């Protein structure tokens, strides 16, 4: 199933990957600068503050590996600092966009607070940025969720079929 869901023609463009070693406050600037350097239009941003190793083969996806982030405040601040400049660039260029927030797996109180915060961030920003056609969506993996499941959902949301989703949270692996 993954091979058909993640076929290259679903997402056209350039893949950008930035490490969390870049200061979070400068992440958005780095995204915009790198896209300008490549003369690429970035219309999808994936924020992964979980610290998992992320390999991006999908074009027009910016992956942020937040390996150095520890608590819920770091996760939420990092997500906001990554999303805001990208959304600002889309608004200025009058372009739509997808902001995909990948939450950490369930765990202690800090992980649960970060998950709830990212879900609320997606809901709130979907209302604030709907007039600009910017679609924030959160993915909340369960304890037993496989990386392929997250990848398939992310590919679906980044495809034209995912254009109808905004401000929602997808909880994977829960009954």
Residue spans for each PLM region:
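C-terminal helical subdomain
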Residues: 81, 131-134, 138-175
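Rossmann-like short-chain dehydrogenase/reductase
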Residues: 2-141, 154
């Amino acid at each position: 199933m993954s091979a058909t869901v993640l076929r290259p023609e679903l997402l056209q463009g350039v893949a950008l990957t930035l490490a969390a070693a870049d200061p979070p406050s400068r992440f958005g600037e780095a995204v915009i600068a790198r896209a300008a350097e490549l003369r690429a239009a970035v219309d999808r941003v994936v924020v992964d503050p979980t610290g998992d190793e992320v390999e991006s083969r999908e074009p027009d996806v910016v992956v942020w590996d937040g390996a150095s982030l520890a608590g819920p405040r770091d996760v939420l601040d990092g997500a906001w600092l990554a999303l805001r400049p990208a959304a600002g660039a889309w608004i200025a260029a009058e372009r739509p966009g997808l902001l995909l927030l990948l939450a950490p797996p369930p765990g202690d109180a800090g992980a649960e607070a970060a998950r709830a915060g990212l879900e609320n961030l997606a809901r709130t920003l979907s209302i604030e940025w709907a007039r600009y056609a910017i679609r924030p969506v959160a993915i909340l993996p369960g304890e037993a969720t496989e990386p392929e499941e997250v990848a398939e959902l992310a590919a679906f949301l980044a495809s034209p079929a995912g254009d109808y989703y905004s401000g929602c949270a997808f909880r994977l692996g829960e009954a």
